Amino acid sequence: MGAPSPDQDIAAIRRNYQRASLRSVDLEADPVEQFRRWLQQAIAADLQESTAMVLSTFDGKRPSSRTVLLKAFDKRGFVFFTNYGSRKAEDISAHPNVSLLFPWYDLERQVAIMGPAERISRAESQAYFSSRPFGSRLGVWVSQQSQVISSRQILEMKWQEMNRRFANGEVPLPEFWGGFRVAPTEFEFWQGRENRLNDRFRYRPQQDSNHAQTWRIERLAP
């Protein structure tokens, strides 16, 4: 018999999830606070890129996904930054509903967040842009994100040009760059469990008897 095919090798790859459990009594009533707790645990575990999230958008015909970095969050939503001429920004302009996925594999857990995205204020974008290192601010001016280029040399030449242009270290925030905030309408917290009997809890908004917004929590079958 010959060696197993690559597909057979892949099919045999599996692990049994046993690190933790997630019970309804463990959950915060507010999903933002539940997310905060899990994010703090991911950071404390020294996970690589613990603030990385997979952003999925839709252009009207097909979805697309990419990894971006979470830069702020509160009860209003979850913030990331990008070029406003990028594919993701164009998708959001036409179809604002997106999803975010935080895949914390080493903790055998993930968080999915769904909701519409919209641009944040220029003042908020300016505050974050000013906090970035010089090279990161310069890079924003260098790259026309998602545009076809003939070679890497184009980027390197543009870098030198921008480096000369902003040699004094003062790099302004360009009009074509800034943040988006995703306002959550649904959360799902997933914790891997033994024998694939994983724990899943979904949060959806509801109104209480005083017409204040609260969150309905439901356990989902794995």
Swiss-Prot record:
Q: Does the keyword Nucleotide-binding apply?
A: no
The UniProt record lists the keyword Flavoprotein? yes
* GO biological process terms held by the UniProt record: pyridoxine biosynthetic process
Q: Where does FMN bind?
A: 66-71, 81-82, 87-88, 110, 145-146, 190, 200
Name a Pfam family for this protein.
Answer: PNP_phzG_C
Reactions listed under catalytic activity: pyridoxamine 5'-phosphate + O2 + H2O = pyridoxal 5'-phosphate + H2O2 + NH4(+); pyridoxine 5'-phosphate + O2 = pyridoxal 5'-phosphate + H2O2
Q: What is its EC number?
A: 1.4.3.5
Where substrate binds, per the record, is at 14-17, 71, 128, 132, 136, 196-198
What does the entry comment about cofactor binding? Binds 1 FMN per subunit.
> Which NCBIfam families is this protein grouped with?
pdxH (TIGR00558), PRK05679.1 (NF004231)
Describe its assembly. Answer: Homodimer.
Q: Which family does it belong to?
A: Belongs to the pyridoxamine 5'-phosphate oxidase family.
Name used for this protein in its record: Pyridoxine/pyridoxamine 5'-phosphate oxidase
